[in-house]
Regions:
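Conserved Rossmann-fold NAD(P)-dependent oxidoreductase catalytic core, especially the SDR/UDP-sugar
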Residues: 2-43
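Active-site Tyr-X1-5-Lys
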Residues: 25-28, 39-65, 90-91
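Short-chain dehydrogenase/reductase
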Residues: 30, 36, 41-49, 75-83, ...
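Hydrophobic alpha-helix immediately C-terminal to the catalytic Tyr-X-X-X-Lys motif of short-chain
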Residues: 50, 54, 85, 145, ...
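C-terminal substrate-binding subdomain of Rossmann-fold SDR/epimerase-dehydratase oxidoreductases
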Residues: 92-93, 97-212
């Protein structure tokens, strides 16, 4: 990516998906906006931070710090939290939670595509900036996420394990006010996405693509 950025013309528009996992654990209140210090934990987040630093040297670049993505797509990422927990609700009917109070922000995959379209249509006023992209009403803990799922799968059981530690220590509340101030509004709620996943997983469970 560094080589690609060096070869770009000055007029080239660059829209880059980065990640809000770069915030790591947030401040003392776990609150993060685009000015918050970055504390990446995973190698993935560390490399995304390095890429973003190079990216923002480009005058026409925009970085989207995406929340954890969810929703049906042609080739699923079941390891992402909403997709994962909903899959477990369909197939296992239970999940064991470690550090269930840890919070994350979420965004539907179709809203991700919509924010790229929004940036292309509003590039002149958005360029040269970093934007968090997530659902402002979906800064929720793992336990709260399970409660969202349980509303649609009443027999889904989640167990809050008091012993043990989640290897993923991300815990933060993310502000999306900056991207919203440009006129971007999300369309796909957490409830809607969970319903979509439940339907999708039920349809593909016994198909050739049941492992997606």
């Amino acid at each position: 990516i560094g080589l690609m950025l060096k070869l770009l013309s000055k007029d080239q528009i660059v829209l880059m998906p980065t990640t809000n996992s770069a915030y790591g654990t947030g401040d003392k209140d776990n609150y993060c906006n685009e000015e918050s210090p970055l504390r990446p934990i995973s190698q993935y987040a560390i490399e995304k931070v390095e890429i973003e630093q190079e990216l923002m040297e480009q005058l026409n670049a925009i970085s989207f710090r995406l929340a954890t993505v969810f929703g049906m797509s042609p080739r699923m990422r079941i390891d992402l939290l909403v997709n994962d927990f909903t899959y477990r609700a369909v197939n296992d009917r239970f999940v064991v939670l470690f550090e269930s109070h840890f919070k994350r922000n979420y965004i539907h995959v179709r809203d991700v595509s919509r924010v790229f379209q929004h940036a292309l249509n509003n590039h002149d006023v958005m360029k040269g900036e970093i934007y968090n992209v997530g659902l402002s009403d979906a800064n929720v803990s793992k336990k709260e996420l399970c409660e969202y799922i349980q509303k649609q799968v009443p027999d889904f059981i989640f167990i809050d394990e008091q012993i043990g530690k989640d290897p993923d220590q991300r815990n933060y509340i993310v502000s999306n006010e900056k991207i919203e101030s440009t006129g971007f509004k999300t369309e796909f709620s957490l409830d809607r996405g969970i319903g979509e996943l439940l339907k999708g997983y039920t349809m593909i469970k016994n198909s050739l693509y049941g492992n997606v």
